[in-house]
């Protein structure tokens, strides 16, 4: 079973969303990014870390170091639910295949529907296929 698929329901049961996970080359460092309504704090990270340490041992997942943190202000958007939740926000994204010779865009996420993300860039609306999105992140409001 995929590690993401293993962790997602476990974290949901604790009241957290699995935003992302990273594994270092060799798999010895495991980074888990979590969120919940209202955001996460250090106590949340400690709670999840303690729970996952035991859970991963039972599931026989090989790693040396576990890091649990919030996704940060520039959190990645990966799921359709993320795009719906953050509609109206500024995002920067990278496409797998260039559109009109360009792969990187910054704009306002307007909506996602039927596998198409609508991104407003300089007053123009772009229709981007979700399958062509390589990376999407929020642009922090400072």
UniProtKB/Swiss-Prot annotation:
Main location: cytoplasm
GO CC terms of this entry: cytosol
InterPro entries: Ribosome_maturation_RimP (IPR003728), RimP_C (IPR028998), RimP_C_sf (IPR036847), RimP_N (IPR028989), RimP_N_sf (IPR035956)
Protein's UniProt keywords contain Nucleotide-binding: no
Location in or out of the cell: Cytoplasm
Similarity section: Belongs to the RimP family.
Protein name: Ribosome maturation factor RimP
UniProt source species: Nitrosospira multiformis (strain ATCC 25196 / NCIMB 11849 / C 71)
Gene transcribed to yield this protein: rimP
